[in-house]
Amino acid sequence: MSSLISGISLRNRQLIAFGSLLLFSALTRFINLGRPAELVFDEVYYVDGARDFLAAGVELDNGAAEFIVHPPIGKWAIALGIQLFGDSPFGWRFSAALIGTISILLVFLIARKLFTSFFLSMTAASLMALDGLHLVMSRTALLDIFLSFFILLAFYLVLQDRYWAAAIVMGLALGTKWSAIYVLAALGLYLLIRDRKFFMTPIQFGVTPLLVYLFSWTGWFLSDDGWSRNHSSNALASLIHYHREMLNFHTSLTTDHSYQASAWNWLVLGRPTSFFYATPNNCGSDSCSQEVLALGTPFLWWAGLISLAITIGYFVYRREKSAGLILLFLLSSYLPWLAFPERTTFYFYAIAFQPFMVLSIVYVIAKALEDENKRKARRELAMVAIALIALCFAYFFPLYVGGVLNYDDWYARMWFTSWI
């Protein structure tokens, strides 16, 4: 076996290793994607919106009690899966699973650019693949996985100095969820200060994303049946009125929810979000539990909290560009939520900055490997840590994919009462 492996070139061994990881990522995201076979959590809103897009090109104002409070892009993405695979649980979630898998490839490419190391690139991609929150969001037809992907893609494009493309992608992020505006503002301000292009930068990261955002509303403009479309004879005035209503909804959302979680406890996994829970009778026990729990892999997230503090320290004392960019995207995706402690928020919103938490961990590993005398031992220690994270991921895996457990096994995974 060793002679067979030694006969394969280093490049081909690397391709096999990464291909295997990508295959693992795809399998964990696509196998049994139709489970649960019903709409879970906010899928009820977004799948319904996707159906409207396919039927009418716009989310319809049909007198229903619901109010549409997010832009169209993410729901168009969900609609693509339904168009390809039918109005079925697999179809609802296909696009999320595809984007989630591509995100792992993207993190690999980003780490390759930042750290110029195959080992560190594989570490970054592996940690993404082994995160429970990313897996759950990749298997659920919500908007946040698309938001996370667009922000991550913009980061990659900035690393490539492709600023126009990054601006367009940030427009797509904004057209998915408004929370992208914090990242857009932070990125634009950073580039304005760095490059001092006081005319071009505002056009790139002000006008361009706005035009992309407005373009995402094309179906609304072309229809007479969209929400608030007929508020005024002037379509733009109607859109502005509608956006005021949306803004009022977001700023006044304080309704209690059993799984709400303030932003301050996201990093410590204080209150994960249960998307689905049932008590089936097919686990060979008197009492069974089936759950889809949006919970980051605990060992990974707690390591991420420590790594974040270390990365901030490195940036403060060394002003390293890579640390600064990681922190720019991470903190602009996270810190604004701390300003709204009364608003109803959920832990799974953290998926927007989760990739940058992973990159923060890899950044700290990269710093640890700079000492050549200790590199071998520290690399082995990093591999042990990844193995422990993998075991932790495997332990919680049934909760991520809606697997059926007997009640005692399910309860054993509730490490804190706040997870129930």
Name each region found by the language model.
Residues S20-L21, V107-L130, Y163-A165, G324:
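Transmembrane-helix signature of polytopic, membrane-embedded enzymes
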